[in-house]
Amino acid sequence: MSNILKSTKLDIALVKPYFKTICFTLLLPIVFAAINRSLLTGVSFAMCFIAMTTGYTFSITEKNSMDRLFGILPVRKSELVIGRYVFVLAMGLLSLIISLIAQPLVLKVLGETVGAFDIVTAAIAGVFLFALYTVFQIPGYYKYGSIKGRVFMYIPVAGFLVTLLLLSKMPAIGNSIISVVESSPILLVFLAVFAIVVMYAVSIFLSIQIMKNKVGNCETRDARSQT
């Protein structure tokens, strides 16, 4: 556990110069929520934006050729990978908390009514969308790097646009979902948590295997260059 936390702290140190940029990305969804007068849309937008910052650590690592450093650190590859997931999840959780505090306040100032049901629904949707984005992004970055895998940065944008399209084109489905949430909120939360846990378990497993293969290939190339 200590090595996982050390790995997380390393990622925090790597991304520290970008903290101002990350904080700025949380202001835009507040404006978006105010324009649309919707907490659900605003929180979904916030989680989309913060998911796009997932590639920062991979970009910094790649630019500074830190793959070999990770190969010689006295830390298991699985601990490095899990530490990065912890960092990403912490960023997502912090962004969600800020959004669920700031956006309802702005909406109330504008005269909108924001109840507990709206906050819970927005929180569940935000967490699920963030998980849905990052479980694909992180293995993609591990596999292709931040440059070749730049396309993975736009997964949240595509997902958010699809979400908006579905909400606008299929109001009947939206109403049925709301009725399900109102009738059995505990079941919905359980299913959402279960789906998120399964998705992250598979994603972490894939990332660990990719990381091990990449480090192994680097060690093989180094051995060949010395002979």
What kind of feature is each model-predicted range?
Residues 79-81:
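Alpha-helix N-cap/helix-start motif at helix boundaries, enriched for small hydrophobics
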Residues 72-77:
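Short helix-to-coil transition segments within interhelical loops
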Residues 1-65, 83-227:
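Hydrophobic alpha-helical transmembrane segments of membrane proteins
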